[in-house]
């Protein structure tokens, strides 16, 4: 039998910045076991007194943009400035495969051994909401352990960008120089949540020229989208592989934070906490449905009936909820 978690001792060790304790605490908040969930709530309650001034940045990008290379370059630049950097991931594929993304550390070999950086693969969970819950709570653990910059990478496709945008201060979108329409290939809605945009792989020569042209075209298009007086996402060029102009991207991230202002940042985080409250409710209901004896008793039969077309989805849903309510 697994011994109960000594939450108070774990809190002290996290605040003392012990890496093993940070890993243990994140494992605890990722767990779906009811006893672990209770311990995780106690842990997070005790850690809430930690300073909330860490810079939270979400990072996404088009396929093949070199996201991991860029994150490693940015993270290395930041630790060189004296920051402590935490890197987390939200990966919808872990919902389907049931496993975590183990490639994050292997793709960021230099940053993974940096004593002032902490990289955590995306957790496995039954739902994207579960992954988001674990990631948001892992972020709080890292901040309590003194990590003052948190980079959250979105992996794969789907709603992960919107999910991450709901837990960070600034959302950075990476794109590539393209022939023709620079907006082509950027998913609908992504520009609504992007605060800073960088055209990556702007290495020397033709690549840099193409990237600068793309950035200019994209910036022009954005000015037509955003109204006067609002924050218009700046479009920069950078090269994650060499680190070129990564510092300029970071400067724009800080400028966006200044644009929000202290009260604006507090209001944004408060709204995010309220949204996160309801996300936790939905995730907990998912967990309870999965554990429900009544639901388990009828699930297989309903599954067969729905697949066979003998029962429609709304009726099946009503039966599942009735079984859950009867527990």
For the regions a protein language model found, what residue spans apply to each?
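Short hinge/gating elements
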Residues: 7-11, 65, 122, 201-205, ...
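Long, well-ordered amphipathic alpha-helical subdomains in the mid-to-C-terminal portions
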Residues: 22-24, 237, 248-325
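Well-ordered beta-strand positions
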Residues: 149, 170, 195-196, 234
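Canonical P-loop GTPase G-domain recognition
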Residues: 196, 202-259
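Conserved phosphate/pyrophosphate-binding and hydrolysis machinery centered on Walker-type P-loop NTPases
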Residues: 15-16, 29, 33-37, 64, ...
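Nucleotide-state-sensitive switch-loop elements of NTP-binding domains
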Residues: 5-65, 71-160, 167-174, 179-182
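Flexible active-site lid/hinge loop adjacent to a nucleotide/diphosphate
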Residues: 179-209
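Alpha-helical scaffold elements adjacent to nucleotide-binding pockets in ATP/GTP-utilizing enzyme cores
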Residues: 101, 138, 163, 167, ...
């Amino acid at each position: 039998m697994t011994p109960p978690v000594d939450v108070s001792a774990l809190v002290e060790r996290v605040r003392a910045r012990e890496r093993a304790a940070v890993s243990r605490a994140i494992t605890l908040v990722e767990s779906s076991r009811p006893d672990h969930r209770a311990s995780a709530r106690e842990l997070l309650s005790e850690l809430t007194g930690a300073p909330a001034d860490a810079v939270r940045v979400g990072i996404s990008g088009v396929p093949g943009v070199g996201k991991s290379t860029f994150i490693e370059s940015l993270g290395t630049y930041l630790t060189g400035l004296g920051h402590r950097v935490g890197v987390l991931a939200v990966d919808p594929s872990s919902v389907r495969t049931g496993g975590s993304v183990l490639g994050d550390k292997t793709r960021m070999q230099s940053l993974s051994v940096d004593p002032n950086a902490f990289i955590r693969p995306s957790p496995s969970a039954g739902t994207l909401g579960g992954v988001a819950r674990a990631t948001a709570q892992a972020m709080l653990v890292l901040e309590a352990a003194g990590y003052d910059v948190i980079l959250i990478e979105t992996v794969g496709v789907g709603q992960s960008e919107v999910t991450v945008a709901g837990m960070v201060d600034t959302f950075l979108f990476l794109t590539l120089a393209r022939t023709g329409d620079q907006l082509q290939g950027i998913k609908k809605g992504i520009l609504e949540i992007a605060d800073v945009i960088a055209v990556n792989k702007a290495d020397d020569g033709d690549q840099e020229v193409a990237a600068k042209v793309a950035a200019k075209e994209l910036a022009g298009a954005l000015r037509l989208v955003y109204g006067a007086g609002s924050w218009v996402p700046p479009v920069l060029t950078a090269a994650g592989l060499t680190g070129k102009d990564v510092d300029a991207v970071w400067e724009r991230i800080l400028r966006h934070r200044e644009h929000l202002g202290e009260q604006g940042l507090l209001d944004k985080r408060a709204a995010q906490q309220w949204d996160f409250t309801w996300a936790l409710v939905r995730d907990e209901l998912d967990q309870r449905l999965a554990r429900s004896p009544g639901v388990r008793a009828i699930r297989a039969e309903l599954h067969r009936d729905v697949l066979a077309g003998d029962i429609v989805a709304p009726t099946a849903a009503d039966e599942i909820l009735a079984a859950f309510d009867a527990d």
